[in-house]
């Protein structure tokens, strides 16, 4: 058997060129078969009273990669993730599962191609359990929310409470923006742990933490966005401040210096900020 268009993105574009694809496909096991899962988006640059992404301050630093830049350059001011594309890793069978039936853009495509898409109810439960909220969409939403969390007109006009993404030191003392990351944790007042995507915020020009945002990935809560703000009366350490405290610890500093000798180099992993009850746990691999 010969397979044409074996690359995942290429295979999907042959059938649905009107969908924009995520740059991060991931593989899962469902019913004993390997399945590639990739998020598909509908875009528009004509949504009324909506700001184009390219106008958001610092967008080029946050949204990197070809797929991200294509969205920004296209003047996009509307994006939804209504489809999960699933490709069988062995025989190439492709399914486009609709996870958001309220998207009007996808609704028009479904009218034109009624047999191309499959309802989510027809997806095996084992496969549905692997669907996760996409990092790319979450980056865009959290980037926009940095400014649009301000709901007072005068505060928004003067940009008095603009947030930013924290930075971290990973290699050669160069600061890098902290990327959103997946964790399994229990939210305040929740009954059980959930799989979710989170990112912290700091005030612009400062290093203390002011809030964190999460996108839920499990079951009926899938796609729900929550923001937890900290009291302005108490300053909480942000990732850069935690990096500094780690470097100032005598025992840790001596060990890092030792490891960095004789041609060896220490690479710092992404710093994780994990909310636990009424406190924060920092994990620095």
Model-predicted segments: where are they?
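Soluble extracytoplasmic regions of secretory-pathway and membrane proteins
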Residues: 1-285
């Amino acid at each position: 058997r010969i397979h044409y268009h074996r690359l995942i993105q290429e295979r999907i574009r042959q059938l649905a060129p009107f969908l924009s694809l995520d740059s991060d496909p991931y593989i899962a096991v469902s019913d004993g078969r390997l399945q590639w899962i990739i998020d598909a988006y509908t875009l528009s640059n004509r949504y009324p009273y909506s700001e184009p992404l390219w106008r958001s301050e610092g967008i080029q630093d946050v949204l990197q990669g070809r797929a991200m830049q294509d969205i920004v350059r296209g003047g996009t001011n509307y994006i939804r993730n209504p489809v999960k594309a699933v490709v069988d890793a062995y025989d190439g069978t492709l399914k486009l599962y609709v996870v958001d039936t309220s998207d009007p853009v996808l609704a028009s495509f479904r009218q034109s191609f009624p047999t191309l898409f499959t309802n989510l109810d027809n997806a095996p439960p084992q496969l549905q359990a692997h669907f996760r909220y996409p990092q790319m969409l979450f980056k865009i939403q959290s980037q926009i929310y940095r400014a649009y969390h301000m709901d007072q007109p005068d505060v928004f006009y003067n940009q008095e409470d603009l947030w930013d993404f924290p930075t971290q030191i990973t290699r050669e003392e160069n600061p890098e923006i902290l990327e959103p990351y997946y964790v399994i944790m229990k939210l305040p007042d929740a009954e059980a742990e959930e799989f979710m995507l989170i990112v912290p915020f700091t005030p612009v020009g400062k290093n203390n933490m002011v809030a964190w945002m999460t996108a839920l990935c499990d079951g009926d809560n899938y796609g729900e966005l929550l923001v937890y703000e900290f009291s302005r009366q108490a300053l909480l350490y942000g990732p850069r401040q935690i990096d500094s405290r780690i470097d100032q610890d005598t025992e840790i500093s001596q060990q890092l210096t030792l490891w960095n000798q004789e041609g060896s180099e220490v690479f710092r992993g992404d710093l994780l900020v994990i909310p636990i009850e009424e406190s924060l746990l920092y994990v620095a691999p």
